[in-house]
């Protein structure tokens, strides 16, 4: 998608596939987006970006992997603790993000 800010190198992350409710999509932020932090607390994506000191002029361009309004991965920053694989994980989704050479 044009205008997405994707880190220059490749990233690979793994997610607990059975926790995904919809079809994950890569997109930019939308109203109502949230991420789950360690301990299970939810944080509005807007507040997460402020706390992580993501520059305001970049926030609308940061690439996200989203399951509805639940952010699975703020690409280049953090994955949601909700989707992390653990001892009870049966199926794993591997996601690779690589910026295409121009």
How would you describe each model-predicted region?
Residues 1-102:
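Basic, glycine-rich polyanion-binding accessory segments appended to enzymes
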């Amino acid at each position: 998608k044009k205008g997405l800010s994707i880190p220059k190198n490749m990233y690979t992350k793994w997610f607990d596939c059975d926790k995904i409710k919809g079809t994950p999509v890569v997109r930019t932020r939308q109203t109502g987006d949230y991420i789950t932090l360690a301990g299970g607390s939810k944080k509005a994506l807007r507040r997460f970006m402020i706390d992580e000191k993501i520059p305001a002029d970049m926030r609308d361009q940061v690439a996200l992997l989203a399951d509805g309004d639940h952010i699975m991965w703020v690409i280049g920053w953090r994955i949601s603790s909700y989707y992390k694989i653990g001892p009870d994980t049966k199926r794993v989704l591997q996601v690779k993000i690589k910026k295409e050479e121009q």
